[in-house]
């Protein structure tokens, strides 16, 4: 990357700015610039797109996205220690990198979105990644403001995102993701690619919006999945008792003796629409 974009190696940047990844912020810096390019390429063509990035840290992934020709990157970073390193990248790519200091969970990404295609590419902080994904999945209006999500998670979370019925990893997250998006796991990233190395393998997942997901009220689907998977080993007649139990299941045409992990996304939507 240094040869490609003319910027110093990331290890030098981190040392010069005294940056150490902080566990409280869910940080693990990705220093392998071949990997950051691979992540950016997973999002497809970037030339016409504005990219949202969360938690850029010292900017390894940011640099890859810009070097691959993204029209603009809007990066949200709450760690003020990283801002000088990101400012150097902004100077190197005039007018193409905007850094917003703040908490991504409190950021209205849709309000920040300019005209044209939007893609979200991020090595998400482990402690907020799942909540950010759910926020992006559950706007009332659909299709969403974004064209695709290319995100890094702990592998266990990635497996939950892409899981479908009769899979041990299947749960509320798999239903919400499968309802509104097409999902795939792109590739794994070993712990040694990060500083400091996490204790687990990470994985990159890619999600694209379904044009016409099954009509279903977001709040009702959340209620049903939360109740069903809250007691996932119990029969649905028992786990869904607070929502109507057997009466609800009969109305939806679903056998009350089944368990949550056997239901397809379509059947969960049937239940939500029967509330």
UniProtKB/Swiss-Prot annotation:
Keywords: Cytoplasm, Methyltransferase, RNA-binding, rRNA processing, S-adenosyl-L-methionine, Transferase
Catalysed transformations (reactions): adenosine(1518)/adenosine(1519) in 16S rRNA + 4 S-adenosyl-L-methionine = N(6)-dimethyladenosine(1518)/N(6)-dimethyladenosine(1519) in 16S rRNA + 4 S-adenosyl-L-homocysteine + 4 H(+)
Localization, UniProt: Cytoplasm
Entry EC no(s): 2.1.1.182
Alphabetical list of InterPro entries matching this protein: KsgA/Erm, rRNA_Ade_diMease-like_C, rRNA_Ade_Mease_Trfase_CS, rRNA_Ade_methylase_Trfase_N, rRNA_adenine_dimethylase, SAM-dependent_MTases_sf
Example GO molecular function: RNA binding
Alphabetical list of Pfam families matching this protein: RrnaAD
Residue sites binding S-adenosyl-L-methionine per the record: 28, 30, 55, 77, 103, 123
GO cellular component terms, A-Z: cytosol
Key word rRNA processing present: yes
Lineage top rank: taxon: Bacteria
Broad enzyme group: transferase
Record function comment: Specifically dimethylates two adjacent adenosines (A1518 and A1519) in the loop of a conserved hairpin near the 3'-end of 16S rRNA in the 30S particle. May play a critical role in biogenesis of 30S subunits.
Family: Belongs to the class I-like SAM-binding methyltransferase superfamily. rRNA adenine N(6)-methyltransferase family. RsmA subfamily.
HAMAP family cross-referenced by the UniProt entry: 16SrRNA_methyltr_A
Identification of the protein by name: Ribosomal RNA small subunit methyltransferase A
Organism: Rhizobium leguminosarum bv. trifolii (strain WSM2304)
Lineage: Bacteria, Pseudomonadati, Pseudomonadota, Alphaproteobacteria, Hyphomicrobiales
């Amino acid at each position: 990357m240094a040869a490609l974009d003319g910027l110093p190696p990331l290890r030098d940047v981190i040392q010069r700015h005294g940056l150490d990844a902080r566990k409280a912020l869910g940080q693990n810096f990705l220093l392998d610039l071949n990997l950051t390019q691979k992540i950016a390429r997973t999002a497809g063509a970037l030339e016409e797109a504005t990219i949202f990035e969360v938690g850029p840290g010292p900017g390894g992934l940011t640099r890859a996205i810009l070097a691959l020709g993204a029209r603009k990157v809007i990066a949200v970073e709450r760690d003020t220690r990283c801002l000088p390193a990101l400012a150097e990248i902004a100077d190197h790519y005039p007018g193409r990198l905007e850094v917003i200091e703040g908490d991504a969970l409190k950021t209205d990404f849709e309000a920040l979105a300019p005209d044209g295609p939007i893609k979200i590419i991020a090595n998400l902080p482990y402690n907020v990644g799942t909540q950010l994904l759910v926020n992006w999945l559950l706007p009332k209006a659909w299709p969403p403001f974004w064209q695709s999500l290319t995100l890094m998670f702990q592998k266990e979370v990635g497996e939950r995102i892409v899981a479908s019925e009769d899979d041990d990893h299947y749960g509320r997250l798999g239903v919400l993701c499968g309802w509104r998006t097409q999902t795939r796991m792109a590739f794994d990233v070993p712990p040694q690619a990060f500083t400091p190395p996490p204790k687990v393998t990470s994985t990159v997942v890619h999600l694209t919006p379904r044009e016409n997901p099954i009509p279903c009220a977001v709040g009702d689907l959340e209620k049903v999945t939360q109740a069903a998977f809250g007691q996932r080993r119990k029969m649905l007649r028992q786990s869904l008792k607070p929502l109507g139990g057997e009466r609800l299941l009969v109305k939806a045409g679903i056998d009350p003796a089944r368990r949550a992990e056997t239901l397809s996304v379509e059947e969960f939507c049937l239940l939500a629409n029967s509330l």
